């Protein structure tokens, strides 16, 4: 097995175990197993692992391996935003589960739960995975990967917006609150979305300055996240 594939498998196992640990914590906070929104969210995470193993690992093992590496040239602003994202995600899930257990929001219509499920599924299992399949340079923190001949990607979802992976993650965070039935969880969910918008703006700015061909690509694909809006 090539070293990159071995490293990619380790990364995928780590991510999958982390997701399973998160799922266990969710049900632990809620305090019961007969909670279908929790199982629906679990299915979204499990499906992501399956799709990553089936469609990303065979074509981009080096990209997955790269996501596990720490580089000295990682930007401090990016690491700070990643930390804020982690805190917001932890608050979002904890608040949602406490809300379900203690009944702060109260029952929501089934359509609200299903709408949240659709947003989370489209964002995480479709748009994010599609972005990773298309972009061999889709790594966890911003850096120009000169050692891998980093180049502009303009196919797939990148033909419509310049940062489709961030759009997918924003949809996931906004959808989770509705799926789990917690309006209180929308507060950290919107904070996570705001952090991703800031990260998009900063990353887009440095890509213009540092990645050859990106300015020409940005002139062709005008929208950073949402066509017709921004």
Per-segment meaning from a language model:
Residues 1-158, 167-230:
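Membrane-anchoring alpha-helices and their flanking helix-loop junctions
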Residues 161:
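Conserved SAM-binding loop
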């Amino acid at each position: 097995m090539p070293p990159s594939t071995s490293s990619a498998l380790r990364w995928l196992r780590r991510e999958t175990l982390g997701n399973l640990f998160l799922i266990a914590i969710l049900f632990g906070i809620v305090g019961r197993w007969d909670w279908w929104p929790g199982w629906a969210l679990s299915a979204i995470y499990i499906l992501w692992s399956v799709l990553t193993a089936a469609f990303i690992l065979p074509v981009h093992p080096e990209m997955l391996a790269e996501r596990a590496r720490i580089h000295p040239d990682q930007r401090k602003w990016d690491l700070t935003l990643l930390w804020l994202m982690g805190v917001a995600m932890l608050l979002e899930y904890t608040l949602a589960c406490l809300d379900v257990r203690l009944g702060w929001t109260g029952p929501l219509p089934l359509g609200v739960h299903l709408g949240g499920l659709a947003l989370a599924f489209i964002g995480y299992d479709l748009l994010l995975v599609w972005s990773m399949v298309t972009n061999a340079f889709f790594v966890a923190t911003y850096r120009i990967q000169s050692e891998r001949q980093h180049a502009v990607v303009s196919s797939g979802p990148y033909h419509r917006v310049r940062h489709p992976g961030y759009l997918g993650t924003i949809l996931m965070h906004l959808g989770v609150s509705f799926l789990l039935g917690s309006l209180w969880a929308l507060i950290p969910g919107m904070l996570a979305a705001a952090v991703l918008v800031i990260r998009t703006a900063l990353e887009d700015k440095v890509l213009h300055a540092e990645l050859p061909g990106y300015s020409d690509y940005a002139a062709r694909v005008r929208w950073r996240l949402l066509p017709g809006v921004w």
